[in-house]
């Protein structure tokens, strides 16, 4: 019989790696709480038209990368979410949250799905963390989510990241810019690749996103969106930059940055790392005031957010040695069964230790004491608690420090007090 393999573009995360995920997730949770953001969770699939309207029909995500499957009983096709923002906005509009409070600050850590060519840091099922701030049009809202994102990176110890930022203006600004780009690229249409020719017809801003080396010189000569902005759009962008200056957040203004989703307006940004090679983006985001109207609201809703790829982030952390000091502890104590017939009593001892909040391991396979001790050392247990006939009869147990080899005999209540002491945890081993 053929052995099953995981689906291409997916990966398994085993216990020896999961501590890294827990660490990063914990930092995201704690920093988001500092800024007053609350967690939101949305369904893993939505109606396909949510993404077609929300992300944009001309984007690569909608055109080529969505996992869409058979219609539901009502005849509407469903899609595994390729990004979070459209689903979060749908949830907030459906719940009518903005009528309950004028501002909502939300964060998430969620799995997403795209039909991409699998490679390092780019999977078909992947995880992002992000934040969305709804209801504030002031440039301070952009600075707020940007600062939150950069504080997560700082707390994780990342260095050498580059923040690129640009203004995409409003609808009128972008309409003028699209015409300027068409006028610029049309004389070179024969030199464009097939994808860029298609983008020239549908949305020439997407050409600026091309990674084709043969087009980079042409792209560098393209008109800049900044020159199509009205004075109000320029003033708003400069205010965002002033907030970043006040907070000493370094950035590079990149007037060719457009991002890959059609819902962005005004400020857009991206964070990159040279550790990732050509596909160097860790995350990004921006304003998306028009998304609510696209999804059925009666008016625009000021909103700004970001998303960061967890797998890519963790590749950078690994390359920068940031997991070297992460010490996932083993059990505080391993209960060692000296005689098989005492296994039931030993399990009761382990039960009471765990009820007391003490991380405890016990052998369930009726192996020898030697094998149990070998496992205790392999797992990094700080202590071994021995259960034999004399311990069973007297209620006094031998407790051995596996780091110092010191041993003492105490009743279970006294052992619990010892193991609760901060000094006991100093013996924890990686």
Swiss-Prot record:
It catalyses: tRNA(His) + L-histidine + ATP = L-histidyl-tRNA(His) + AMP + diphosphate + H(+). Disulfide bonds: none annotated. It is found in: Cytoplasm. GO terms for cellular component: cytoplasm. SUPFAM superfamilies: Class II aaRS ABD-related, Class II aaRS and biotin synthetases. Coiled coil: none annotated. GO terms for molecular function: ATP binding; histidine-tRNA ligase activity. PANTHER family: HISTIDINE--TRNA LIGASE, MITOCHONDRIAL-RELATED, HISTIDYL-TRNA SYNTHETASE. Homodimer. HAMAP family: His_tRNA_synth (MF_00127). This is Histidine--tRNA ligase. It comes from Chlorobaculum tepidum (strain ATCC 49652 / DSM 12025 / NBRC 103806 / TLS) (Chlorobium tepidum). The gene is hisS.
């Amino acid at each position: 019989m053929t052995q099953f393999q995981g689906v291409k573009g997916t990966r398994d995360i085993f216990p020896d790696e999961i501590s890294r995920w827990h660490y990063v997730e914990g930092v995201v949770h704690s920093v988001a709480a500092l800024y007053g953001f609350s967690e939101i969770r949305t369904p893993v699939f939505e109606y396909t038209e949510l993404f077609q309207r929300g992300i944009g029909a001309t984007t690569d995500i909608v055109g080529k990368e969505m996992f869409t499957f058979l219609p539901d009983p009502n005849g509407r096709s469903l899609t595994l979410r390729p990004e979070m923002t459209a689903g979060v906005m749908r949830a907030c509009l459906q719940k009518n949250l903005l009528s309950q409070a004028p501002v909502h600050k939300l964060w998430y850590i969620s799995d997403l799905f795209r039909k991409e060519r699998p490679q390092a840091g780019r999977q078909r099922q992947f995880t992002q963390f992000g934040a969305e701030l709804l209801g504030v049009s002031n440039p301070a809202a952009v600075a707020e989510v940007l600062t939150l994102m950069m504080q997560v990176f700082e707390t994780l110890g990342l260095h050498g990241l580059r923040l690129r930022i640009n203004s995409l203006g409003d609808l009128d600004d972008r309409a003028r810019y699209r015409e300027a780009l068409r006028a610029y690229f049309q004389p070179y249409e024969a030199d464009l690749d097939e994808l860029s020719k298609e983008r020239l017809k549908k949305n020439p801003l997407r050409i600026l996103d091309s990674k084709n080396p043969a087009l980079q010189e042409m792209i560098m000569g393209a008109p800049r969106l900044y020159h199509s902005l009205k004075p109000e759009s320029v003033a708003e962008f400069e205010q965002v930059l002033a907030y970043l200056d006040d907070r000493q957040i370094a950035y590079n203004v990149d007037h060719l940055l457009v991002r890959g989703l059609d819902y962005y307006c005004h400020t857009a940004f991206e964070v990159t790392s040279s550790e990732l090679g050509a596909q160097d983006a860790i995350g990004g985001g921006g304003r998306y005031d028009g998304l609510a109207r696209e999804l059925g609201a009666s008016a625009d809703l000021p909103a700004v957010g970001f998303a960061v790829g967890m797998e890519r982030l963790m590749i950078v952390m690994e390359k920068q040695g940031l997991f070297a000091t992460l010490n996932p502890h083993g059990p505080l104590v391993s209960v060692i069964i000296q005689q098989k017939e005492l296994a039931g009593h030993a399990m009761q001892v382990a039960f009471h230790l765990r009820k007391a909040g003490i991380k405890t391991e016990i052998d369930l396979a009726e192996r020898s004491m030697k094998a149990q001790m070998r496992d205790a050392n392999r797992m990094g247990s700080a202590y071994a608690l021995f259960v034999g006939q004399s311990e069973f009869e007297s209620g006094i147990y031998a407790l051995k420090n596996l780091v110092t080899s010191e041993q003492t005999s105490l009743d279970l209540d006294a052992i619990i007090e010892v193991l609760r002491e901060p000094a006991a945890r100093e013996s924890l081993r990686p």
